[in-house]
């Protein structure tokens, strides 16, 4: 499971300056079953030169007793000082995509949502947006699929026996659902439902 963190405010390479939340606080996290993804509009939270920066700390955090991961699955943080309006535009568009309110983008990966937000920022602010895109760095796995609600059971129908052919029909009540065929825990194929 994941939560989304969106932050705007002053930053440093080791902290969210305006709140005082810093790398030491991240290293004290105890959650081992919920790992957030994080978009930050703040100066230098991703400045990784010469120090383990705030963004890296989020990815490396582990429980002090068990050693299990407690940090983020991915972050988008700036390596330089950020301006205000362009990255706010980018983050606003990331939120629209994440909550499926954007008419122009259907990205589901952290990197896809992040880059689509950057492109909207670039379209709106030109070279000022481009500068922010150049220095907003994705830490973690950009291909991780993110969502705003837990997966649900869906109604699916298919033949009870499947031949060894390379395809078979499956019908589902939810358009664009991801379905997976597995045998004894081994994934054989995954596809997206199209036209029921």
Placement of each model-derived feature along the sequence:
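Alpha-helical scaffolding within the catalytic cores
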Residues: 16-30, 51-64
